[in-house]
């Protein structure tokens, strides 16, 4: 027999990553009752910490965090070099990249961004997955978002007026269900949502290794006869 939670939430979110947590905060600000179900029991993981957990934040993300007063709670970017910015100022300043192709400030037409508010924040920052999740989880809990860890969504059934979500032998009800559970999303697969896009051309792996004479490797992006490597920080290679 399945155990049923008698509460009916406005929204259930699958996944307590940065996207799920930020969405939960926004919904809570709109007075919605929110439940997050996260399959991992422990939010702390070596894969979320430096060096594996290093992440780049784009301009819209930085601005969203700034507007909610969360940007000042991030500390790691103050101690790491942003490899996607150069020392130049003004029109020649690098403000980002796309697959390694640099964006120079003087070549960016900001008038094309119809829905972007002008501001003084950086266009890119380096952060860490665990730091970002910690800041967002703290805010979500302050907004009375309920987070249950160690419960993965295993299925759901949609009705005219809501969704019944299954997690093992437990049932939860909500008016809406949102899948923020990654590339292998159970919500997407169960709901038969299309995952449009192109097939990958290569697979990347993360590993911690000892390299002889690491000082011989140049910083930044480097193209060689045998391929390309990126050294974003001393000892951080891709």
Language-model features: locations:
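Core beta-strand elements of the Rossmann-like FAD/NAD(P) dinucleotide-binding domain
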Residues: 7-9, 167-176, 180
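A short, Lys/Arg-enriched amphipathic alpha-helix followed by its capping loop at the start of a domain
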Residues: 23-32, 64, 143
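Glycine-rich FAD pyrophosphate-binding loop
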Residues: 28-53
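A conserved short coil-to-beta-strand element within the FAD-binding core of flavoproteins
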Residues: 149-163
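Conserved FAD-binding catalytic core of PHBH/FMO-like flavoproteins
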Residues: 180-238
